[in-house]
Amino acid sequence: MSRPSRLLICAATALLLASPALAAGYVAELDPTPFDATNRADVIESIGNLTATLEGSTLTVQGTFSNFTSPATGGSFRIGLAKGVPGDAIGALTVEHARQGSFSGTIKLNTAQMAALKKEALYIRIDSEKAPDGNVQGWLEDSGKDHVS
């Protein structure tokens, strides 16, 4: 291979490595968890929203919640069998201990969790003192927007 060809290949490789990576964007609206007559008043007015980015296999979320009747106590990344089907916790969130506030978290997803994200089976749940099994929850949906990182 000639010297100019090698230089061209090296320059092209350096340019590709220096290019910004695209991160996939996700959103979710947090709605009250399923309720019955015993906990309806504790969750019915609660709302929230979030944005998330996926860089490689690392999912990062940031969001807010409001209208809780008691302070939030925690939150989690969760995986269900499909969108709308509740499932198990796969990671923890940092949640403000308040009736309205913010939350955030980062999790490294494995292959099965990445597949679940693509089929919208990953969701976020925020718990509170009066609703320890979930005050609000929302399934992650592709925002249709990629972000430069």
List each model region and its residues.
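Bacterial N-terminal signal peptides that target proteins for export
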Residues: 1-10
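Metal-centered catalytic cores of metalloenzymes
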Residues: 2, 20-75, 79-149
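N-terminal signal peptide c-region/cleavage motif recognized by signal peptidases
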Residues: 13, 18-20
